[in-house]
Every structure is written in structure tokens, then in C-alpha cells.
Amino acid sequence: AGEFVYDRPFLWGSRRTGPDLHREGGKRGDAWHFKHMYNPRLTSEKSIMPRYPWLVANELDLSKTKDKINLMKNVFGVPYSPAQVDSLDAWVKNQSVGIANRIVSEDSDIKKQIETQKAEKGKDFIPLENREVVALIAYLQRLGTDIKTAEVKTASN
């Protein structure tokens, strides 16, 4: 599929042990993905997928993101513009805050859990927008959304 032309390494093999994710973007809310990563049985009762609770807890390391973007642009030909590279930090922050806000607005239980963590951890609290799970949700929500199709004029339309 064309939307994966810039994925490195190529992500989709021929063996399938779970659902295809190539069109996952936009199908489910951000809170659904948050809960699914924390414990898949919360969203899919018979899921055999393992839990990934550390993604919900760990802080995302963005220290090499700009270097990775430049590598993708300069070595692999990903068409990032200079403006996109220059505004990367603001773009990442805006996207992560938006996802974090949607997670807590879509699920009141998650909102309560985050508020409780904030009260308990004090200065050691990691804001939701700075956690690894938010970056993964951003990626999942893009899958299958980059290819736009144009309507082709035919004799029947």
C-alpha cells in the first residue's frame, strides 16, 4: 500500500497473527487505543494480545526526533519541507496535547486515573501528553489515512 512507502524498516510481512492495522487510522477513538495498549481485554474480551502497561507509564524521549526526521528526509527521500522540520517541536507538542485531551474527554475513568496519579506523584508525575502511548496512538491514527483517492469520471457517472 502506498501510504507505507516511507516506513523504515518495512513493517508489513506476510505472516498474520493479529488484525491488519493498515487501515486503522480514525476507526476508533484515542481512549480506546489507550485502554487497548494498557490491557487489550478491556476493549476486546478474547484478545490474545499482550498488555503494554509501560507504554502508558513511560515518558517519551524526543531528544533524537529531529535527527530521525532529517535522516528520513536526507537518506530515504521522505518529502519533509524545511518548514516542517523547523516547526517539529511545536507540531509534536500540539499533536500530543490534542491526543491527551481527547483521551480524557472520551473516557471519564481514564481522566480520574490521570488526576489521581497527578495528585499522588506530585513533581514526579508525567503529563499524559508526554507518555510513549500517545506517540503510538498518533501513529496508529495515521495508518491508512495518507492515501487520498480521486473520483474517476466514467461513462456511468
Regions found by a protein language model. Give the residues of each.
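Periplasmic c-type cytochrome electron-transfer domains
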Residues: 1-157
